[in-house]
């Protein structure tokens, strides 16, 4: 009836014709802009009848690991694939050495492309050259130089956060592990980001809202996202939360300024480190602080939840780690030296990262790039380096098995002491990236993770809820994320030592 009504009105024919023309233009624009780089084989293409490639995108979001594996099984080194951000290149780990320090292959533009950093509300994922430089320098230089001074305050703050956020009742208590860990990390690390008491809840809401908005928007064709973002409820909620974050952090900046003026103490926070790293260049300090906080929160929570779920199923590993914590703490207290000597814990974190990596190493070309084998990466093209050598039997015997002692043993082999450490990226282990653009905050992350796990091990027993095991991760598109909704049972225990 509606079709008949439209066709019988004076404007009916033009409306129908206009709809057909607009649809055709959208179809042609979308399919012509998704070029096939280097005439490489294109996987997961929806074909001419998959309008705006919606079916192909949803297939990638649902079944990316199988699609990527089939690509490397068939084409070995490099291929193109239609994903939820357009057509991307997927390259084998053999390309890692060419990527590691290439000046035209950038990390932040890749993050911005993945998470819509060019759109309002998504600013904490944006890439802006001055801000990118300040962020890297502040982490690589100022944070790294201050890390020794941060260990004791972090240990105290994380211990307090665990007391506040984890159950204090006797007997076994069921918790949603991801929710508790998020709030623990947000509160325990707040001193370097924001001292406002509302910060922990804000940063948890921000991370959740960003994830939901990014996923919801990624379901739409790339060319429509700028328009759709203005109406999607998830995007509007993210925009609202970001606005409240600006207000919260402005309030915190005023408080910090007054506190520093009255005490004269050396500030150990990103607001001050950004100033030092800026060298007088202008930047948005609120957005920059949110960017670093989001990147840190996501990685820290992911790693800690993954290892705690593994520990809940392995009482022997828990016992061995507790012995190590007691021995190291009684000798070194809270210090960088102590964290270095937690070698079994270091190995367990690195093995979690090997078995369940958080994502591929991704780059975007900011200029045309030609690699040694003639592969051309066009400006604006995104490319991901696969980490599948981390599951390679030739590199890691019994690779499918989670062996928390693997890298502990490797560190005892000649020449392996450094490369087998959690914070040491290699072409065979891309958990923190690789080369000069490997995660600059990995030393801070390792410190927070080890301190947090020490507190949990000493203060709590942990086991699976309802006997459920093996549910450590959930996969979405190309990411292998911690199962943040997993439930465990925890019980307060009397620690052998007070830390």
From Swiss-Prot:
Its EC number is 1.-.-.-. One of its GO terms (biological process) is dehydroaustinol biosynthetic process. Its main location: membrane. Glycans are attached at residue 483. Pathway: Secondary metabolite biosynthesis; terpenoid biosynthesis. It is a single-pass membrane protein. Heme binds at residue 439. GO terms for molecular function: heme binding; iron ion binding; monooxygenase activity; oxidoreductase activity, acting on paired donors, with incorporation or reduction of molecular oxygen. Pfam families: p450. One of its GO terms (cellular component) is membrane. Keywords: Glycoprotein, Heme, Iron, Membrane, Metal-binding, Monooxygenase, Oxidoreductase, Transmembrane, Transmembrane helix. The chain crosses the membrane at residues 10-30. Its cofactor is heme. It is found in: Membrane. Disruption phenotype: Impairs the synthesis of austinol and dehydroaustinol and accumulates the intermediate compound isoaustinone. PANTHER family: CYTOCHROME P450 (PTHR46206), CYTOCHROME P450 MONOOXYGENASE AUSI (PTHR46206:SF10). In A.calidoustus, the austinoid gene cluster lies on a contiguous DNA region, while clusters from E.nidulans and P.brasilianum are split in their respective genomes. Genetic rearrangements provoked variability among the clusters and E.nidulans produces the least number of austionoid derivatives with the end products austinol and dehydroaustinol, while P.brasilianum can produce until acetoxydehydroaustin, and A.calidoustus produces the highest number of identified derivatives. Cytochrome P450 monooxygenase; part of the gene cluster B that mediates the biosynthesis of austinol and dehydroaustinol, two fungal meroterpenoids. The first step of the pathway is the synthesis of 3,5-dimethylorsellinic acid by the polyketide synthase ausA. 3,5-dimethylorsellinic acid is then prenylated by the polyprenyl transferase ausN. Further epoxidation by the FAD-dependent monooxygenase ausM and cyclization by the probable terpene cyclase ausL lead to the formation of protoaustinoid A. Belongs to the cytochrome P450 family. This is Cytochrome P450 monooxygenase ausI. The gene is ausI.
